[in-house]
Amino acid sequence: MTDRYAVIGNPIEQSKSPLIHTAFAQSTHQDMAYGKVLGPLGGFAQAVDAFRAEGGKGMNVTAPFKLDAFAYATDLAPSAQMAGAVNAMKFEGKRVYAENFDGVGLVRDVVHNLACPLRGQRILVLGAGGATRGALLPLLAEQPAELVIANRTVAKAEELVALAQTHQRAAVPVRACGLSDLAGKAFDVVFNATSASLMAEALPLPASVFAPGALAYDLTYGKGLTAFLQLAQQTGVTRLHDGVGMLAEQAAEAFAWWRGVRHRRSEERRVGKEC
């Protein structure tokens, strides 16, 4: 019998996860099907319950449900516990096992696929939601010179700073600030972890945040440049990357976790782009 998997989110029509996992399944000869589930806002648990009742084996979780998945799971891996968010679930009987592969996928894409070492770099992360929580500790493990979390609500960014100071192994300086506090500051790598690009909204960022030669990376993706990457391009940034590579890398981790086999390394970003 074909095993069923899916990605749940809202919106979900833009997701490339089904194409990526189908490519992985074909290359590793796995009998599985992978679809999309549009989760109702406020109805995450009911949507997952229905998928499980139909025989679903596992799900990827995307915005805005990563915190809902954290609450839904019965067994949280250390990566999910640290992040306080979940992006992959595996169903075995009444147990719901949960992982967070976002940070691992992001770091692998940036460091290995894009050949951009993060050690010693000044990093700015925009947003303080589930995506940032998932990426925070893997980014700090790369030992950047500093990491700044900027958010409209500074208190949320400060919560993540406290989390980082409690759990990080490297003594990387981590600070929180509002978006309006970024004037005059420059960074080597700027990550957009907000949902603004999904809504085609540009963030109010000063051009100065992008240091000469900076990398601009949007954790989301779409057709063409996202609103954040368009803004970066307008300020003169040429190293522009969306989250397709991160998506493919975290998908490879989830696929291996579910199926016990791994798609051939080095092909993840290519698969993501082709899909």
Regions found by a protein language model. Give the residues of each.
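Phosphate/diphosphate ligand-binding glycine-rich loop within oxidoreductases
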Residues: 2-114
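Glycine-rich adenosine-cofactor-binding loop
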Residues: 9, 98-103, 110, 114, ...
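Helix N-cap at the beta1-alpha1 junction of Rossmann-like dinucleotide-binding domains, i.e.
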Residues: 12-13, 154-155, 223
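Short helix-loop-beta connector
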Residues: 92, 116-122, 210-212
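Active-site capping/gating segments
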Residues: 108, 221-222, 238-265
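NAD(P)-binding Rossmann-fold cofactor-contacting core
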Residues: 142-167
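Rossmann-like adenosine-cofactor binding region
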Residues: 170-240, 245
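Conserved small/polar residues in nucleotide/adenosyl-binding loops
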Residues: 268-275
